[in-house]
Amino acid sequence: MVNSCENKIFVKPTSTTILQDETRSRKFGQEMKREKRRVLRVINQNLAGARVYPCVVNKRGSLLSNKQEEEEGCQKKKFDSLRPSVTRSGVEEETNKKLKPSVPSANDFGDCIFIDEEEATLDLPMPMSLEKPYIEADPMEEVEMEDVTVEEPIVDIDVLDSKNSLAAVEYVQDLYAFYRTMERFSCVPVDYMMQQIDLNEKMRAILIDWLIEVHDKFDLINETLFLTVNLIDRFLSKQNVMRKKLQLVGLVALLLACKYEEVSVPVVEDLVLISDKAYTRNDVLEMEKTMLSTLQFNISLPTQYPFLKRFLKAAQADKKCEVLASFLIELALVEYEMLRFPPSLLAATSVYTAQCTLDGSRKWNSTCEFHCHYSEDQLMECSRKLVSLHQRAATGNLTGVYRKYSTSKFGYIAKCEAAHFLVSESHHS
């Protein structure tokens, strides 16, 4: 038998003697194979000179009979079915290693197996994990992301006052619901000044501007100022007053508000003094009787201030925002045209405009909308008017509010830049 490794040609012997020797050698080789067969569970263990991963062989010119070829084919299928799965790292490690040639058979007869390294590599079956590799899909490539509007949670603004008995947390919602019901009784007709014979809108503005200065000089609380203005408007909407009595109406309204809100009430003589003795003590007392009877002693009506406190709390405003909102709402007190807005709307607009002024952008969250019961669109008309008042607050003759809030006591808040963008947006729209 001639075997050429270079040409890979197998020459079959023809002599009868050689055939007999071949038969004996084949039987001996088969016995050797049976002795060397191992159990399946250790079939992958390395043998001396053997490959870890079973290689693919190409038989050329074999002398095996058809029956032996079928048996080997069955064994190969069984072997493939029992072979453990091959991982990606194992395949890469094995392909990177240099293939070693098989150990030649001990006898010169039997199966002559020749291994072509290049063909073996090409014929190597791909493991199941690599035949159909799973590529994780990128959701950004397959699905177009849609803008999802996440609702902003509503903050419980009363949770910090749960242990404060004076805050009346259990009843605060009912209280402000009642204020909303009653605020319509505190509103006056927007054209009531037309019924006055000797008065006009400018005279009212002069009176309110002067009372704001008096209120600041006496160091009275904010509730007193808002109640004073409310009493004046309600009285003038029901009673004709001469021009020379208008200042007296303002002094009496301030006196009644102090009696209702303040702990320490100014004496009548002090009020006469600040009027430059234009009125006497009896004039003050007589006007007090007239005003109470005209209003039917109905003093306690909600003004802008209780709403302002509640809405500032809902906005979680800092001190600067509180002062700016107070400045804006006091500017509105002077203007007669602002009477057409209900107290709650005016308070909410003051908070909204103050936030926009400080932040430089429109700001109104779901918590503010929930507690104020006004959307941002409902506030825009009133807000633009407040910005206009802020822009011209330092000019003209009525600058009492501007001078009050231009002091260090109020952090010079009146000098801050107005929210011009709110007015410009209305012009563009």
Curated annotation (Swiss-Prot):
UniProt keyword list: Cell cycle, Cell division, Cyclin
GO biological process, one term: mitotic cell cycle phase transition
The keyword Lipoprotein is assigned to this record: no
SUPFAM superfamilies reported in the protein's UniProt record: Cyclin-like
Highest taxon above the source species: Eukaryota
Cited InterPro entries: Cyclin, Cyclin-like_dom, Cyclin-like_sf, Cyclin_A/B-like, Cyclin_C-dom, Cyclin_N, Cyclins_cyclin-box
Molecular functions per Gene Ontology: cyclin-dependent protein serine/threonine kinase regulator activity
Tissue-wise expression: Expressed in roots, stems, leaves, flowers and siliques.
Transmembrane segments: none
Keyword NAD: no
Assembly with partners or alone: Interacts with CDC20-1 and CDC20-2.
Family: Belongs to the cyclin family. Cyclin AB subfamily.
Name this protein carries in UniProt: Cyclin-B2-1
Organism: Arabidopsis thaliana
